[in-house]
Swiss-Prot record:
Main subcellular localisation: cytoplasm
Protein name according to UniProt: UDP-N-acetylglucosamine 1-carboxyvinyltransferase
Organism from which the protein derives: Proteus mirabilis (strain HI4320)
EC number: 2.5.1.7
One Pfam entry name: EPSP_synthase
PANTHER family attached to this UniProt entry: UDP-N-ACETYLGLUCOSAMINE 1-CARBOXYVINYLTRANSFERASE
Disulfide bonds: none
Binding-site positions, UDP-N-acetyl-alpha-D-glucosamine: R91, R120, P121, V122, D123, L124, K160, V161, S162, V163, D305, I327
Catalysed reactions listed for this entry: phosphoenolpyruvate + UDP-N-acetyl-alpha-D-glucosamine = UDP-N-acetyl-3-O-(1-carboxyvinyl)-alpha-D-glucosamine + phosphate
Class in the EC hierarchy, top level: transferase
Record key words, sorted: Cell cycle, Cell division, Cell shape, Cell wall biogenesis/degradation, Cytoplasm, Peptidoglycan synthesis, Pyruvate, Transferase
GO cellular component, one term: cytoplasm
Pathway membership: Cell wall biogenesis; peptidoglycan biosynthesis
Residues the entry annotates as binding phosphoenolpyruvate: K22, N23
Amino acid sequence: MDKFRVQGPTCLSGEVTISGAKNAALPILFAAILAEEPVELTNVPKLKDIDTTIKLLNRLGTKVERNGSVFVDARHINEFCAPYELVKTMRASIWALGPLVARFGRGQVSLPGGCAIGARPVDLHITGLEQLGAEITLDEGYVKARVDGRLKGAHIVMDKVSVGATITIMTAAVLAEGKTIIENAAREPEIEDTANFLNTLGAKISGAGTDSITIEGVERLGGGTYQILPDRIETGTFLVAAAVSRGRVVCRNAKPDTLDAVLAKLREAGADIETGEDWISLDMHGKRPKAVTLRTAPHPGFPTDMQAQFSLLNLVADGAGMITETIFENRFMHIPELIRMGAHAEIESNTVLCHGVDKLSGAQVMATDLRASASLVLAGCIAEGTTIVDRIYHIDRGYENIEAKLQGLGAKIERLHSND
């Protein structure tokens, strides 16, 4: 199993080019199942989860080629089951179900895996598909969906805000008969990006990015070319990297308007931030960040996927800051690892109180999930001595070539292969 060896402390400074958004690329790849003509996707990140999705699409009979762009040809799908061996590492595979049942009248997906951060039930996905007329059964670890004829448009009020279920319902409703309205929909930029992609193919979706999405069902989708939006979480991670190391970074191929809550907290922490149409710069002018208090919330609130990085910021900041996690349970697994490096923190239920320390010390730590692993790597960059980050397969699921990008900012980081 690969590890990172990081030598610190380092002041991280320079430019970094942001990759396409994993959380948009995944639903868009699955939504391409709906297309009856070939699709070309650009700015698709090179990640483990993307590779797994491509394998899964190929298993279904979709022809997928990666040659700079990703080309998806779903004209000859002949298999309607996403099997356990491909699904077990990635919860996003549930997004195959809506497009399969919408276009072909049937589909089945093994109950998904992914990060070990609390309960992520598929109930909301199932309820939404049932409201569109699908018959759902759970059998031997598989979610199976069927419908005779086309799905039927419906007025769906979601019990709670869910990014995943919003995407499932939206992609299924595109080919449904009549109009679907999703109330209490998630508002994340990646949902808007998925809707924009589908509209490029001929869908009629309006309101994506708000809490009320309207889908006028169409009979078929064609092909087209679409560029995935930049990854706001990767952008935020590199901004925090500069903030905790008292450095300066310019993020290119970024989308500042997807990061309002994060940029506000970084400014509160003392960062000097400037933005352009497709770039963000952060400069700490050599100063230590100030601790901030924040609460995660659905978009446009503070993103849960930036919580671990801001935990690190607070743990090396001037003062004390409180972080409350409202989206997922069990998402402070990075805190005990950071305490091994000399951090001072107390966890009480879904809140962590962070007391800033002057310095961290290198240690052997273990990544537990995708974003937690990023915070441990950044901690290694600023800690005195050597840090070994174990189980970095988590980080490869969500960050493209992170060690090369950090090296470009001056980090002393290397990947140790399991046979090294």
